[in-house]
Amino acid sequence: MGTVHARSLDPLPMNGPDFGSHDDADLVEVEPQKKQEILENKDVVVQRVHFEGLGRTKDDLIAHEIGQVFKAKNLIEVMRKSHEAREKLLRLGVFRNVEVLIDTCEGEDALPNGLDVTFEVTELRRLTGSYNTMVGNNEGSMVLGLKLPNLFGRAEKMTFQFSYGTKETSYGLSFFKPQVGNFERNFSVNLYKVTGQFPWSSLRETDRGVSAEINFPIWKTSHTLKWEGVWRELGCLARTASFAIREESGHTLKSSLSHTMVIDSRNTSILPKRGALLKINQELAGYTGGDVSFLKEDFELQLNKQLAWDSVLSTSLWGGMLVPIGDKPSSIADRFYLGGPTSVRGFSMYSIGPQSEGDYLGGEAYWAGGMHLYTPLPFRPGRGGFGDLFRTHFFLNAGNLCNLNYGEGPRAHLRRLAECIRWSYGAGIVLRLGNIARLELNYCIPMGVQSGDRICDGVQFGAGIRFL
């Protein structure tokens, strides 16, 4: 009997395999010659799809993920669509392993060109644990987690996570529920407590909150609608905290609605070589309760272009504005901050803009832009291996952060944002840590320094996910 084995379809190129030039040609074992003609040169029909190893997973969940397999018309399409179905099944987060077997049909109703596709799956245990480390914006943390995957059989999961970092400690409980047949449409609820230390402001903040959010795609964009209610406790981190920080101390209750839209065509989020990113976020607080009221808008734009000699030119632009609603001024916990190795390099962490006695208070409006040139290391050491994780980095950054008088009008706002621009330039080395984070070691030359700014003239180290 002629049999086609496809137990691991990862090496299969999406444009169809070239059986004459790839190592995975031995995946096809055909006998006798008549069957070979049927499989290779004629249309085929997928008559049945079987699953082996299913336990608590519901049939309607997997039926949506494998529906395209039945539409395949030839052997190449069967293998490709089976590969795509395997990736979709793994993305659900309910299986530890998925293997595929493609075989000719047997039985009285078997067609001469009929195929059976069998998915051999291994479900995750009902309770799993994890231990790992994470890199944030110039901060590292240890993360312990417990997860209940596939809680009700339709890819739901409940997660408890504890994180201990250099500046922040948090724990939270979350529930995640995707829409059957459309994993990008999902709903989640989170309960959390976060305690953070912000030495640049001599501030300690503890947040206890609950949030609910819905994620969904529209055309080429992804959207998030979120409600968040949080009880915030602000306190002084040191006895030397300024009077402005002491005034901010106390308790506030924030209830806000937010919307985020993302368009992302980059090939990867860490050191992309091509593509663009546009992210726009709006937040409205006060209309659903709480004692904090404001409207907050911010955006992020990034463009990447691959050049000759494996070089990449990248440009980015950030901006935002916070408008208090009512008589109360904005809270230090809601304002924007700028400066540091992940934004305007050459300045200390969040040490640009309004300050009081050395404590930085943040601002209600900001912009920041950057231009970067990434090139391979000189002489390409370790090419094709570990050396490809490193890039040479040349950069030019600029930005400004300030408070606005909202009675002056837009022209006055733009004029103030264009005054006293901080900027810097330099060069360094970038290390990509997979698709998790990146590390930078740069030599920075800060320019446009204003009174009260804290600079980092010379070597500066940065670690994180989001960089200007």
Swiss-Prot record:
Keywords: Membrane, Mitochondrion, Mitochondrion outer membrane, Transmembrane, Transmembrane beta strand
Biological process according to GO: cristae formation
Cellular component terms (Gene Ontology): mitochondrial outer membrane
Subcellular location as annotated: Mitochondrion outer membrane
Its membrane topology: Multi-pass membrane protein
Family annotation (PROSITE patterns): POTRA (PS51779)
Pfam families found in the cross-reference section: Omp85
Keyword Transmembrane carried by entry: yes
Region Disordered, residue ranges: 1-24
Residue ranges occupied by any POTRA domain in the UniProt entry: 44-124
Keyword Secreted: no
Superkingdom per UniProt: Eukaryota
Free-text function comment from the UniProt entry: May play a role in the maintenance of the structure of mitochondrial cristae.
Summary of subunit composition and partner proteins: Associates with the mitochondrial contact site and cristae organizing system (MICOS) complex (also known as MINOS or MitOS complex).
Family: Belongs to the SAM50/omp85 family.
Domain observations: Its C-terminal part seems to contain many membrane-spanning sided beta-sheets, that have the potential to adopt a transmembrane beta-barrel type structure.
Name of the protein: Sorting and assembly machinery component 50 homolog
Organism: Xenopus tropicalis
Name of the encoding gene: samm50
